[in-house]
Amino acid sequence: MDRAVFYLRIFPGSEAEYDRRHAEIWPELVDEIRESGLRNFSGFRRGTDVWYYTEAGLDVATALAVHGPKPANQRWNRYFRDVIAQITDDSGELLWYDEVFHSGGPPLDGPFERALFGLVIDPDRADDYEALHANPWPDLMEAIEASGFRNYTGFRRGAHVVYYGEFYPDMTTVFAKMAAHEVNDRWGAAFEGIITTITDADGNLLAADEVYHQD
């Protein structure tokens, strides 16, 4: 299973319209997304910044390449020409984030919340950030699983990192449980000087609101 995140930016003032159009997308577009092999496809918006998390059986890039020329998708893209300000780089590639961390865990029953939040690192310490996540401590991984994180995955693009997760029963409860584990403080201390921004002025995580989901 391949996991991926890409980014887009919408025009200021178009936030409500972007959300409205995604509240109920066209049935023919839903069919095309499924035919292309994309699964667990979720969009999250914070202001004019939007991130999409998705999965595919082989690889997401191939599935999106299959999806791109489909007729409903072409009409959908044109429909957003006055809403989306940027979705590709100068070469025409989507603005991908690279996966740097993943935690799975056995399936859990009951309700859960899909969520995405971001943080900023010192770009000069990007190698240190990735090295720590390439070999996470066993007791950290145990605490993550025990706290109710599932499919918890980090992605980086430059100095910006986003985390997607499925939180049982919700993100607030899961992070409160995680904070009770001693390893959480040690892990946080390891990133002093690496992570420069992780909360807003009120101390809240920089979370984005889910505006779209398709299984």
Predicted feature descriptions by range:
Residues 18, 26, 44, 76, ...:
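Tyrosine-centered aromatic motifs in long, intrinsically disordered, low-complexity repeat arrays
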Residues 14-38, 125-150:
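Short amphipathic alpha-helical segments
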Residues 18, 53, 62-64, 129, ...:
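Short acidic, gly/pro-rich beta-turn/loop elements at beta-sheet edges
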Residues 32, 36-39, 57-93, 147, ...:
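An amphipathic, aromatic/His-enriched active-site/gating alpha helix that lines ligand/cofactor pockets
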Residues 30-59, 141-170:
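Short, glycine- and small/hydrophobic-rich beta-strand elements in well-ordered beta-sheets
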Residues 2-16, 112-127:
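Short glycine-/aliphatic-rich beta-strand segments at the starts of folded cytosolic domains
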Residues 88-107, 199-215:
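Short, low-order "capping/linker" segments at domain edges
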